[in-house]
């Protein structure tokens, strides 16, 4: 009798004295602090890193290009993940409980899905933009205009938000797995299981665009390699020691394609394990251990923090823009016309 009582006392609940409360599986103080630091850092990096990207592109007139507007909108999606999703997921992952109410649980799930699919669709648009820029640079300015970029942005957001909210607010994700949903439902939990059909659809919505992007970037790099060889073969015949304007533009476009290709690859590597696991779970009665699932989810979340780091490493203009923003010199009246592509930018 005493033994049974001690076992009952050992079980922690998310909400004490509440019927049907979820069971809490707390970490010891050391690992708990480390998890909060690591996961919280990801949220801060995603929020502030992508905020810097948006400010840089929207403030500096030299960056007002169709490609950069797509990048700014992509950064907006990742910024929203860092603000509306990751902080709450941090608490849920560390405390193993959801303390933010049922209403925001549903919003959180919709935000999570919407912003992540928005990132995917933006990357698809960017890959098409880079393909045209590298393979047909002469007509690129007339083919992929700011208006075309705007249409891509609107459609990416519209389909992402419509798809996500229609799934979770109609209950379509729960059809056929009602017993599982009842078994998982408890006070302090926030699960949104998907049935097999929706999991398969989500996987295809991820897989098909990514296969297309891999194909497009492969074509881009083949063309870029051919262009580089052509420039090298004609370099000795050049009358001027300095590069021609056309060559400089071609180099810039190839570098942009390479950088954005790396961003696409990072997205693929971050997402693929999670989606493969989701498909396996849907067809094998959700066999994934909770800690494995948490690791896969946070690999996806951390992708939202990676793009600013990629830009900072490969884009010289982004580093210069950050210096101007952080130093406060961006507040000067003429700062928006700063030449970020010159060898040296006046920052004094």
UniProtKB/Swiss-Prot annotation:
GO terms for cellular component: plasma membrane. Keywords: Cell membrane, Disulfide bond, G-protein coupled receptor, Glycoprotein, Membrane, Receptor, Transducer, Transmembrane, Transmembrane helix. Disulfide bonds join 22-186, 105-190. Gene3D superfamilies: Rhodopsin 7-helix transmembrane proteins. It is a multi-pass membrane protein. Its main location: membrane. It is found in: Cell membrane. CDD domains: 7tmA_TAAR6_8_9 (cd15316). Residues 174-187 are annotated as: Extracellular Loop 2 (ECL2). Spermidine binds at residues 112-113. GO terms for biological process: adenylate cyclase-activating G protein-coupled receptor signaling pathway; G protein-coupled receptor signaling pathway; sensory perception of smell. The chain crosses the membrane at residues 34-58, 69-90, 106-128, 149-170, 197-218, 257-280, 294-314. GO terms for molecular function: G protein-coupled receptor activity; trace-amine receptor activity. Residues 1-33, 91-105, 171-196, 281-293 are extracellular. Belongs to the G-protein coupled receptor 1 family. This is Trace amine-associated receptor 9. It comes from Homo sapiens. The lineage of its organism: Eukaryota, Metazoa, Chordata, Craniata, Vertebrata. The gene is TAAR9.
């Amino acid at each position: 009798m005493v033994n049974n009582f001690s076992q009952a006392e050992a079980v922690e609940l998310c909400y004490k004295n509440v019927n049907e409360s979820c069971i809490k599986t707390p970490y010891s103080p050391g690992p708990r602090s480390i998890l909060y630091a690591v996961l919280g850092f990801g949220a801060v990096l995603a929020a502030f890193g992508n905020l810097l990207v948006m400010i840089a592109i929207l403030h500096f007139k030299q960056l007002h290009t169709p490609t950069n507007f797509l990048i700014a909108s992509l950064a907006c999606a990742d910024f929203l993940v860092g603000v509306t999703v990751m902080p709450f997921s941090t608490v849920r992952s560390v405390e193993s409980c959801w303390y933010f109410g049922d209403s925001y649980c549903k919003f959180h799930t919709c935000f999570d899905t919407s912003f992540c699919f928005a990132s995917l669709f933006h990357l698809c648009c960017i890959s098409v933009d880079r393909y045209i820029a590298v393979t047909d640079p002469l007509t690129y300015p007339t083919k992929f205009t700011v208006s075309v970029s705007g249409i891509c942005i609107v459609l990416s957001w519209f389909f992402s938000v419509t798809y996500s909210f229609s799934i979770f607010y109609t209950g379509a994700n729960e059809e056929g797995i009602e017993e599982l949903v009842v078994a998982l439902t408890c006070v302090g939990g926030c699960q949104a299981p998907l049935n097999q059909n929706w999991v398969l659809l989500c996987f295809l919505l991820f897989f098909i665009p990514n296969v297309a992007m891999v194909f497009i970037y492969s074509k881009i790099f083949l063309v870029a390699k051919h262009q580089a060889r052509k420039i090298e073969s004609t370099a000795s015949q050049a009358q001027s020691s300095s590069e021609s304007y056309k060559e400089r533009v071609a180099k810039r476009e190839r570098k942009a394609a390479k950088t954005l290709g790396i961003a696409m690859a990072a997205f693929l590597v971050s997402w693929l394990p999670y989606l493969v696991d989701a498909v396996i779970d849907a067809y094998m009665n959700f066999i994934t251990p909770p800690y494995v699932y948490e690791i896969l989810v946070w690999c996806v979340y951390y992708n939202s923090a990676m793009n600013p780091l990629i830009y900072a490493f490969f884009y010289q203009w982004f580093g210069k823009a950050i210096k101007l923003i952080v130093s406060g010199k961006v507040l000067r009246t003429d700062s928006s016309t700063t030449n970020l592509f010159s060898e040296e930018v006046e920052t004094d």
